[in-house]
Amino acid sequence: MSVPLFEKVAFIGLGLIGSSLARVMIAEGLAKQIVASTRSERTLQDAKALGLIQQGYSDPVEAVQGADLVVLALPVRATQKVLETIKPYLQEHTIITDVGSTKGNVVDA
Protein backbone atom coordinates (compact mmCIF):
# COMPACT_ATOMS: atom_id res chain seq x y z
CA MET A 1 0.00 0.00 0.00
CA SER A 2 1.29 3.47 -0.85
CA VAL A 3 1.81 6.31 1.59
CA PRO A 4 -1.34 8.42 2.07
CA LEU A 5 -1.32 11.83 0.41
CA PHE A 6 -2.72 13.52 3.52
CA GLU A 7 -2.10 13.13 7.23
CA LYS A 8 -5.45 14.61 8.26
CA VAL A 9 -8.48 15.58 6.18
CA ALA A 10 -11.25 17.61 7.79
CA PHE A 11 -14.69 17.69 6.21
CA ILE A 12 -16.86 20.62 7.20
CA GLY A 13 -20.31 19.33 6.36
CA LEU A 14 -20.99 15.66 5.85
CA GLY A 15 -24.05 15.42 3.67
CA LEU A 16 -24.35 13.47 0.44
CA ILE A 17 -21.33 15.02 -1.27
CA GLY A 18 -19.06 15.21 1.78
CA SER A 19 -19.76 11.65 2.85
CA SER A 20 -19.27 10.38 -0.71
CA LEU A 21 -15.86 12.06 -0.90
CA ALA A 22 -14.92 10.67 2.52
CA ARG A 23 -15.86 7.17 1.34
CA VAL A 24 -13.61 7.49 -1.74
CA MET A 25 -10.72 8.84 0.35
CA ILE A 26 -10.96 5.82 2.63
CA ALA A 27 -11.27 3.35 -0.25
CA GLU A 28 -8.22 4.84 -1.97
CA GLY A 29 -6.16 5.23 1.21
CA LEU A 30 -5.67 8.95 0.62
CA ALA A 31 -5.55 10.03 4.28
CA LYS A 32 -4.25 8.67 7.56
CA GLN A 33 -7.07 10.36 9.46
CA ILE A 34 -10.46 11.70 8.37
CA VAL A 35 -12.52 13.87 10.68
CA ALA A 36 -15.66 15.93 10.19
CA SER A 37 -17.68 18.72 11.64
CA THR A 38 -21.41 19.02 11.19
CA ARG A 39 -24.32 20.40 13.18
CA SER A 40 -26.02 17.01 13.52
CA GLU A 41 -24.70 14.72 16.25
CA ARG A 42 -26.66 11.88 14.64
CA THR A 43 -24.82 12.39 11.35
CA LEU A 44 -21.48 12.26 13.15
CA GLN A 45 -22.46 9.07 14.99
CA ASP A 46 -23.64 7.43 11.77
CA ALA A 47 -20.47 8.46 9.92
CA LYS A 48 -18.30 6.96 12.67
CA ALA A 49 -20.37 3.76 12.71
CA LEU A 50 -19.95 3.45 8.93
CA GLY A 51 -16.20 4.02 9.21
CA LEU A 52 -16.30 7.26 7.20
CA ILE A 53 -14.57 9.30 9.91
CA GLN A 54 -12.42 8.60 12.92
CA GLN A 55 -13.62 11.62 14.88
CA GLY A 56 -16.56 14.02 14.72
CA TYR A 57 -16.96 17.55 16.03
CA SER A 58 -19.80 20.02 16.34
CA ASP A 59 -17.30 22.91 16.12
CA PRO A 60 -15.46 23.28 12.79
CA VAL A 61 -12.53 24.96 14.55
CA GLU A 62 -11.83 21.71 16.42
CA ALA A 63 -12.05 19.68 13.22
CA VAL A 64 -9.50 21.74 11.28
CA GLN A 65 -6.78 21.64 13.96
CA GLY A 66 -3.72 20.09 12.30
CA ALA A 67 -5.51 19.30 9.02
CA ASP A 68 -3.52 19.47 5.83
CA LEU A 69 -6.71 19.33 3.71
CA VAL A 70 -10.04 20.96 4.57
CA VAL A 71 -13.07 20.10 2.42
CA LEU A 72 -15.97 22.53 2.72
CA ALA A 73 -19.10 20.56 1.87
CA LEU A 74 -21.57 23.21 2.95
CA PRO A 75 -24.47 25.14 1.51
CA VAL A 76 -22.95 27.95 -0.57
CA ARG A 77 -24.43 30.64 1.68
CA ALA A 78 -22.69 29.20 4.75
CA THR A 79 -19.24 28.88 3.19
CA GLN A 80 -17.94 32.42 3.71
CA LYS A 81 -18.95 32.55 7.39
CA VAL A 82 -17.35 29.18 8.11
CA LEU A 83 -14.17 30.15 6.25
CA GLU A 84 -13.88 33.32 8.31
CA THR A 85 -14.36 31.26 11.49
CA ILE A 86 -11.74 28.60 10.71
CA LYS A 87 -9.16 30.76 8.92
CA PRO A 88 -7.19 31.75 12.07
CA TYR A 89 -6.82 28.07 13.00
CA LEU A 90 -5.47 26.76 9.70
CA GLN A 91 -1.83 25.88 9.20
CA GLU A 92 0.12 27.78 6.57
CA HIS A 93 0.28 24.76 4.25
CA THR A 94 -3.38 23.69 4.64
CA ILE A 95 -5.18 23.12 1.36
CA ILE A 96 -8.80 24.31 1.34
CA THR A 97 -11.32 23.17 -1.23
CA ASP A 98 -15.07 23.28 -1.50
CA VAL A 99 -17.79 21.45 -3.37
CA GLY A 100 -20.09 24.45 -3.85
CA SER A 101 -21.27 25.60 -7.24
CA THR A 102 -20.08 29.21 -6.92
CA LYS A 103 -16.57 30.39 -6.15
CA GLY A 104 -16.60 34.20 -5.77
CA ASN A 105 -17.38 34.23 -2.06
CA VAL A 106 -14.88 31.42 -1.40
CA VAL A 107 -12.04 33.29 -3.10
CA ASP A 108 -12.98 36.55 -1.34
CA ALA A 109 -12.86 34.89 2.09
Q: What are the roles of these predicted feature ranges?
A:
Residues 40-41, 76-77, 103:
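Alpha-helix N-cap/helix-start and coil->helix boundary motif
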